[in-house]
From Swiss-Prot:
Its main location: cytoplasm. One of its GO terms (cellular component) is nucleus. Transmembrane segments: none annotated. Its EC number is 2.4.2.7. GO terms for molecular function: adenine binding; adenine phosphoribosyltransferase activity; AMP binding; metal ion binding; pentosyltransferase activity. Its cofactor is Mg(2+). The lineage of its organism: Eukaryota, Fungi, Dikarya, Ascomycota, Taphrinomycotina. PROSITE patterns: PUR_PYR_PR_TRANSFER (PS00103). This is Adenine phosphoribosyltransferase.
């Protein structure tokens, strides 16, 4: 993987202290999507990871909301299906729903029944791996539908939160954030 391409993406990230609340250092990935060159580099690097780290993917599952920014494009380029995992009351039809713990609350994710067939090889994609709670909930949804979870793919990992240790499959990230929270801050 080219250091120049990785550095180009890293230089697009913007940190916002005390957002969305005091003590949080927010890593903003949105500038990547405002620059066509950066977005193209992102998709190329993610596709390279799919081709080298994971074999024969049938389905890419994108997590609401920022997994939707690149998940469908990646699925198109990888010639596989895209399936969204959404918050409650956002999908019609028969659903499988799981609850998961967040830092200060609980939340839920849902997936439509039948969108993943038993035995299909599934890759979960999202923007940032922090504590791993949302990805772990998606793992459970995939396995409940009978999918074979082959891995996770993230744009950015906040390594000091050790979310990778909670996940049920191999995990690949393009970028890593700081190894620890600065000045006792948390990351989001």
């Amino acid at each position: 993987m080219s250091d120049d391409r990785i550095n180009y993406l890293k230089n697009k990230l913007v940190q916002y202290p005390d957002f969305p609340k005091k003590g949080i250092l927010f890593e903003d990935i949105m500038p990547i999507f405002q620059d066509p060159r950066a977005f193209g580099i992102l998709i190329d690097l993610l596709l390279e990871a799919v081709e080298t780290e994971f074999n024969n993917i049938d389905v890419i599952v994108g997590l609401e909301a920022r997994g939707f920014l690149f998940g469908p494009t990646l699925a198109l380029r990888a010639n596989c299906a895209f399936v969204p995992v959404r918050k409650p009351n956002k999908l019609p039809g028969d659903l499988v729903v799981v609850s998961y713990n967040k830092e200060y609350s609980t939340d839920s994710f849902a997936i439509q029944k039948g969108t993943i067939k038993p035995g299909q090889r599934v890759l979960i994609v999202d923007d940032i791996l922090a504590t791993g709670g949302t990805a772990l909930a998606a793992d459970e949804l995939v396995t409940r539908l009978g999918g074979e979870l082959v891995g996770h793919l993230f744009l950015l990992e906040l390594t000091f939160l050790q979310g990778r240790k909670r996940l049920m499959a191999p995990t690949y990230t393009l970028l890593t954030g700081q190894d620890e929270a600065p000045d006792g801050s948390e990351f989001a």
